[in-house]
Every structure is written in C-alpha cells, then in structure tokens.
Amino acid sequence: MKHIRNFSIIAHIDHGKSTLADRLIERCGGLADRQMQAQVLDSMDLEKERGITIKAQTAALQYQARDGQVYQLNLIDTPGHVDFSYEVSRSLSACEGALLVVDASQGVEAQTVANCYTALELGVEVVPVLNKMDLPNADPDNAKAEIEDVIGIDATDAIPCSAKTGMGIDDILQAIVAKVPAPRGQADGPLRAMIIDSWFDSYVGVVMLVRVVDGRLLKGERIKMMASGAVYNADGLGVFTPANEPRDALAAGQVGYVIAGIKELQAAKVGDTITLEKKLPNNAGPAAQALPGFKEIQPQVFAGLYPTEASAYDSLRDALEKLKLNDASLHYEPEVSQALGFGFRCGFLGLLHMEIVQERLEREFDQDLITTAPSVVYQVVKADGQVLMVENPSKMPDQGRLSEIREPIVTVHLYMPQDYVGPVMTLANQKRGVQMNMAYHGRQVMLTYDMPLGEIVLDFFDKLKSVSRGYASMDYTFKEYRASDVVKVDILLNGDKVDALSIIVHRSQSQHRGRAVVAKMREIISRQMYDVAIQAAIGANIIARETIKALRKNVLAKCYGGDITRKRKLLEKQKAGKKRMKQIGSVEVPQEAFLAILQVQE
C-alpha cells in the first residue's frame, strides 16, 4: 500500500487539465502509441468539444521514481464545473493529493478556487503546478502570488510545466511521489469501498468506479450497498490504465471498477459505500458504518422539455431513460401542458447541466425539443401551515391561499480584474444581490453576494460575461430558503391562461417583466380575423395588455356616397360575424413564443 498514490487534477476550464493528463499517461506508458489520442480521458464528443470534463475517469499508471522504486499512481480525473460540484467532492475524497493546475498566463479562476477549497476541507494535499509556460505571455511570478493570495497555500515551489511541449512532466510525477501521502486504511479490515462514479454499459450493465478504502474485494464475492441495502454479485473487477484491464482482486488503496450485473444507475449512487454481504471464513465480514460524505443530489433548476411533434413523445421518453442510465443527477417526470401537449418536467443540477442534457438529446438521440423557461424550486407555506415545494409555475396555488413564498438563496463568489468591479456590482444589484464581502487579491477582486437562484438561472451568467468582457468568473453554492415577495405572472390570450408561459418573479419586477413578455408576444402571434387581447395578470389584476388588431375587409368599398344607415348596416353585419368567429376560434401560439420568454431582456 505504501507504493500507491491516488491523486486528481483541479483546474479551471481550458487551463490544460486533460492535456496534462494525456502527458502523464504517455510518460508512464499507460497506453500503446497507437491508442494514444488527444484528451484520452474525455470520452464523450461533447466533452471534447466544449473542452470540459463531465464524467470522472481514471487511469492507473506505473511510474518508476528516481530512487528506482516503482509506484502505482492512480489519476482520478474530476469534472471542473460548478454544476458538478458533488461529483468533484466524491472524486477528491477518493484521493490523498491533488495537482492544482493554474494557467500561468491567466492566473486563478473562480471554479479552481471553489474546487481547491473543497480539496483543502477534505484534507487533500494540494500540489501547485503552473501550466502553459511555453506561452510568450506566461507570468509565473504573478500566478504564484495569486495562488498564495487567493487560495492561501504556499506556492514558492510550484512546478513550472507545459503539457503541450511535455516540459516539467517528470518533475510533476516526482512531486506526486514525494508530497502526496500514501493511502491510509486497514488492509485486513472489513471491506469499505466508495463509489466515485458509475456509468451504464449496454453489454455488462452498470460499471462502478470505486476506491477501496479498507479491506479487499475478490471476484465473485457478494457485495452490499450501504445506502440502499441491495445485494449483488461482484462478477468482474479490474483497473483502467485508461484501457480496462481485468483483475481478480482489488486491495485497500486501489482504484478500479466493479461490475455486478446491476440494471439501473439508481442502484449505484455516487458516494455510496460498498461492503460485503456476510462474514465468511476467508473475509473480514461487512463494515459497521459507511464512509462519510454521502448525500442524495437534489436538482436545483427545472425546465419542461417537449417534443416538437406529438408523435415523438415515446422516443423522447426512451432518450431520457438512456441518458438517465449515465447521469443519475437528471430527474424527469411526465407533464402535460395545454399549449405544448405531452412532455417532461426535468430537474438539473444547474444551467450548464441543462444545456448539456439538451445538447446530448438533440445530438445523440436526434430529438427536436422545445424547452420552457428554466425555473427554480420555491418553498410555499399555505395558510394552514402546510409546506409545499413548487418547481413549476403552473402548479403554484392562488396567492389568496398562501401565507408566504420562500425562494432559494445562493452564495455567489465572483472573481474579476479590478477594472470591472463597477459594472459587475451594478449587475449584481439589479439581480437583487446583497453584498456580503469584497476582497482584493493583487489585481483580482473577489466579491461575495447572497442572491436569489431564480435571478441567476435566467441570464446572469451571460450578462456577467458581457459586462466584464469575459474576464469575470463565478461559482455558487446553495445557502437557504428565504421568505420573499414573489408573485406568479400569468399570460392570458383572449382571457385564456397559457400555462407554459407563466413565470414567477419578484413583485418589484413583475410589471416590467409582464410588459416585456406581452410586447414580445404581440410581435410573434400572427393577426387573426378578430382582435386578440394579450394580457399579463397577477391573480385577477391585469398588469399589462397589448391588442393585436383584427384583419378586416373594407366592406364600405362599394358604397358611393349615399346614406349613413346603409354603411352602418354593413359594418354591424361585419362586426357580428367577427364576434361569432371569436367565440369559436382559438389562437395558435407558435413555438417561438416559448423561446421568446427566455429572451425577454431586462
């Protein structure tokens, strides 16, 4: 066990994490030359394209250190984005060390800091690495100062390297051996292994990526999940070098995979502990308590997904089922909307997660989708004291029957160069943010705000990037539910509610948003043979209205002069016809209307 090192790489998007991983694998001869390709660990096309890592991957590498001893290095690749923070914390808790990769030309970014704090809280040894030293504008001294300032760890001996040219790779491997502690655990105690990640393979079922903490697991043993109590047979074990390599046993300190004939991903939850079912002569029996840190993931952002063709409902359901096999944090349930027909209400971890799910549905499963405006979960307290969680604006009870509505508040950390502090603060105040802290680190500023999640979900990230010319970065963590004056705004067409267009907003912005939506709808809905009234209402109060004028034929064209009563008769006749039409006609709401809600600019 003392020759094993488990480590992961922490880095902001585009700071060169996956390329560095490629170099480490190449240097240790993890793959034959013909199997080597760029970004070996990012197996999904979408991961390569967006340059982000979504699922955790691992590689077990053999490295001969300078003292001649061969070490087994387990690289656990972590997702870097704030939406996947739970997966990051699981990956990190499976390691004893982490390489903190910072782009020498850009310095420290928000998500790096968030993940680095997670690592420090878990007691992981952090080794700073300055990447992209081959760039002409690399500024290692400034990057070191930022690491010390912002994160507060000693960066004097940060390792300079360039993953692109391969410089400094040996120094990194040597530092891992020297600085990262060996795994602690009882090699002969009861088996405890943590699930770092799991994914679905159509051939063998669910594959679990595990880190064995105590004891050992032999092929063919009966294993038990401690969170659910389910029992399975460990049919296959092995390690990834990134290519998979079967083994007969996994011992304490090792990272490998377990295949146990599990049919659905729900059964293998990330963070759960695996132990043995019962004591037998050749093993130490089941563990008394699970490893700490497991929690069920709760979705934060909800949106409706509907097929553009009603006939595609079944294929959308199949696509969601298949996605769910590989993404346990995706929640969905069937939903019916008067305007859009049959579809699903889906829950996501955050906005990036939502975009990725949509993109994978469209790309891998050829689905054409309409997505309703994203909304967050509100806590609603009814007059009789009953507390409901409402994730869909159309399910919100009438204002009259409620005593209060609480909205989710998150703590947001914003990092930016000091030139952009003004515009960013203005933006945060517009979004009802309350400033909690402000700290200067060299040329970088860190602002901390408490802000409603509902405001962030709409377009905060895009706005933040535009007011800071792309330099600001952010991450957020859920804080609490707080009572707030939010109201539900309904959109009516000729007096009929269109459920999919309802929005929940703060009362101070309800007029403004209501007007904006109504004006947008007026541009989109085509003219009918009768007047169409578009209204925004809070309960029974109409707060905004636009009218689409009717198309009408000029019935007076054939009257030359003559009596006014003759003209009046023709006009009355036309009016009666329009009135009859209005009673039986219904207004078609085009698809663009639902997307327009998303684009209503502040």
UniProtKB/Swiss-Prot annotation:
Membrane topology: Peripheral membrane protein
Catalytic activity: GTP + H2O = GDP + phosphate + H(+)
Gene3D superfamilies registered for this protein in UniProt: 3.30.70.240, Elongation factor 4, C-terminal domain, Elongation Factor G (Translational Gtpase), domain 3, P-loop containing nucleotide triphosphate hydrolases, Translation factors
Compartments in which it is found: Cell inner membrane
GO BP annotations listed: positive regulation of translation
Keyword check for Oxidoreductase: no
Gene Ontology MF term list: GTP binding; GTPase activity; guanosine tetraphosphate binding; ribosome binding; translation elongation factor activity
Summary of the function given for this chain in its UniProt record: Required for accurate and efficient protein synthesis under certain stress conditions. May act as a fidelity factor of the translation reaction, by catalyzing a one-codon backward translocation of tRNAs on improperly translocated ribosomes. Back-translocation proceeds from a post-translocation (POST) complex to a pre-translocation (PRE) complex, thus giving elongation factor G a second chance to translocate the tRNAs correctly. Binds to ribosomes in a GTP-dependent manner.
NCBIfam families named in the record: lepA, small_GTP
Name listed for the protein in its UniProt record: Elongation factor 4
Organism of provenance: Verminephrobacter eiseniae (strain EF01-2)
Originating gene: lepA
